Amino acid sequence: DKALRSLRSRSFFLELAMEHYADELLALCGVGRTNLLYTGGGHCYLLLPNTERVRRGAAAWNARFNDWLCAQFGVALFLAHGFTECSGNELINHPAEDSPYRQMFRRVSSALAAHKLRRYDASMLRRLNGRRADGGRECRICGRTDSLVDDRCEWCRLFVELSEKVQRCGMYYVSADPGAAYDFALPAADGTAYVAFMDEKTARGRMNGGGAVTRIYSKNMAYTGLRYSTRIYVGDYAYSNSIEQLARSAAGVKRIGVCRMDVDDLGQAFVAGFERPDR
């Protein structure tokens, strides 16, 4: 089932989707990536204007993105959001003895938790409950029953195909033009974004030829003179793409193990704040 390739591209897809979500929200609010405080691991923190227009826009964009996630992946994926008002003093943790920075992040976390507990409105629940399985065979990777080819659904086939491109291609070109070649589509705040994986030469040629471009994500490198480009960090290294070859390299029994690492309590660290005892 090419599980190794699928795992890599699934993880990358989630990171790229999160970057895209944040960039669309920033553009919707009329600010740049300077206002993106942190993104990674399926989370992001942004500093946005405290206006009614921004609050409505953020809520509408979140609802649109979750509608798309639900249509594509059912209840397996959901993007919760929450926000709170804050002042300049809270951002610089003043007065420090009152820990306003910590309280600010606690308010955000509470709003986020509340959204997770109430994910769907009545119309979405009716849509989910109205779905009926077609009685066909299930995808042998994820269990979906629609659009199977070789016992794989559309997204699982895509993730296998993308794995090689994640390693080989250094540019991820986002455009609103459905006529150009693309690898997959994501929702945009005002339409659809089409994502194509390519090398630098192809990306520059497409731009110089007048091709539509919304933004470009460059892998691990910052490119001078390449407009619309944002560097993102991608772990594209691999000893081998073959599980069999990895197993043959083992000492003793020819099999592999999986090591999964994570940063403990990263969210709690943001909530608690990074206070300096001497200040």
Which residue stretches match the model-derived regions?
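Regulatory and interdomain segments flanking nucleotide-handling catalytic cores
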Residues: 1-279
